[in-house]
Amino acid sequence: MARTRNRLDRTPFQTAVTDLSHDGRGVARRDGEGGKVTFISGALPGELVRAEPTARSRHFDEAKTVEVLEASPQRVTPRCPHFGVCAGCVLQHLEESQQIVAKQRVLMDNLERIGHVTPQAVLPALTGDNWGYRRKGRFSVRRVEKKDKTLVGFRELDPRFVADLSICYTVIPQIGEKIPLFAALIEGMDGKRDIPQIEFIAGDDAVALTIRHMQPLSERDRQAWVAFAQEHGFAIFLQPGGVDSVHPLWPQDVPLSFRLPQWEVELAFRPLDFIQVNASLNQKMIAHAVALLEAKPDDRVLDLFCGLGNFTLPLARVVREVVGVEGDAGLVARAKENAQRNGLDNAQFHAADLTQDQRSAPWMRQGFDKLLLDPPRSGALEVLQQLPLKTFDRIVYVSCHPGSLARDAGYLVNDQGFTLVCAGAMDMFPHTAHVESIAVFERR
């Protein structure tokens, strides 16, 4: 006889919320469950809520708030009508000034719990634009036959579903206010079932959409996108396959770039390239990192995971030489072009997979005074274990994941004898639980 899985009891329960998790959910311990931890979406520390169970596991349960019985004084009314359904933002119900406080707390907790390190000083949080800041992103697209409509938006909190967005306030207004127009255009296409996603990216002077399509577009559909682009001021790219298949539909020549006025630098990029999503925070972050590095005119600096040269080229304005290393060969090619375009002949770039053995690479043996790195979520442990770390007087580590930063900080401090001078959060993604941070290490 086949075993049947126990059905989840969704009876709402009342509980006190004591903390905020790293992903922005309230944390509660249910006495009736032996003190088992429950993560509750939409709940804040200090609140008494009624919550409905949504999932159970051996070590913790999950639930969603159905009623706030006693509200936190830090609770605010979310601006977005889709809050609580869309997973794009999970902290809109928390006062903006407290969001970054929570992120600082997540960072410090990770450093202590995972890395077993404590910074000598906590840096003041870095903040930028809180609304309309997101200049790069990806919308999912889904034709829902039962609703007889096309949905365009971010994923819902239940990632099986696409949020049916009417607006998004965190995305730049040129995009966030036009989401229903995207859905209407796709709904009218011959190939409306063949569009799985739309990517958007904005430079200082142009906004580009990349349309992923699983089947060739009909001429009628192509002309519909061209007309849409002309009416609303977009550049349209098509992506029938992998990244290399991206090509312009209209216009044929689209200059995409952003400027860093403090450094007299302009960075050109392509539609699917990585750029920092928050333009105002990015400019502050670069200035912050350069200052924390204490870069001097005679310094030679190594910039790992350099991308388009976001840090490399500003550094080239203030140091003798800077070498950028990046795993994406396309980004390296663009970085070299950017250096040439900006008249910076003291910036070199190399393509290298920094998760693999690079000890014989020529750039590894050049000799540097300082190190700046901005790795992906997985961190930089593999390359840190290969570098001649004792040659660096100072390291500035920009992180997009506090857990991997904490692990790498533990290695630098506890295994390699560095001091964690300071660390602090940076609010690259306001209203989300994403924690961007920066840390400074000094050789003892």
UniProtKB/Swiss-Prot annotation:
Keywords: 4Fe-4S, Iron, Iron-sulfur, Metal-binding, Methyltransferase, rRNA processing, S-adenosyl-L-methionine, Transferase. Transmembrane segments: none annotated. S-adenosyl-L-methionine binds at residues 276, 305, 310, 326, 353, 374. The active site is at 400 (nucleophile). It comes from the Bacteria. GO terms for molecular function: 4 iron, 4 sulfur cluster binding; iron ion binding; RNA binding; rRNA (uridine-C5-)-methyltransferase activity. GO terms for biological process: rRNA base methylation. InterPro entries: 23S_rRNA_MeTrfase_RlmD, MeTrfase_TrmA_AS, MeTrfase_TrmA_CS, NA-bd_OB-fold, SAM-dependent_MTases_sf, TRAM_dom, U5_MeTrfase_fam. [4Fe-4S] cluster binds at residues 80, 86, 89, 168. It catalyses: uridine(1939) in 23S rRNA + S-adenosyl-L-methionine = 5-methyluridine(1939) in 23S rRNA + S-adenosyl-L-homocysteine + H(+). Its EC number is 2.1.1.190. It is an enzyme of class 2 (transferase). Residues 5-67 form the TRAM domain. Catalyzes the formation of 5-methyl-uridine at position 1939 (m5U1939) in 23S rRNA. Belongs to the class I-like SAM-binding methyltransferase superfamily. RNA M5U methyltransferase family. RlmD subfamily. This is 23S rRNA (uracil(1939)-C(5))-methyltransferase RlmD. It comes from Xanthomonas euvesicatoria pv. vesicatoria (strain 85-10) (Xanthomonas campestris pv. vesicatoria). The gene is rlmD.
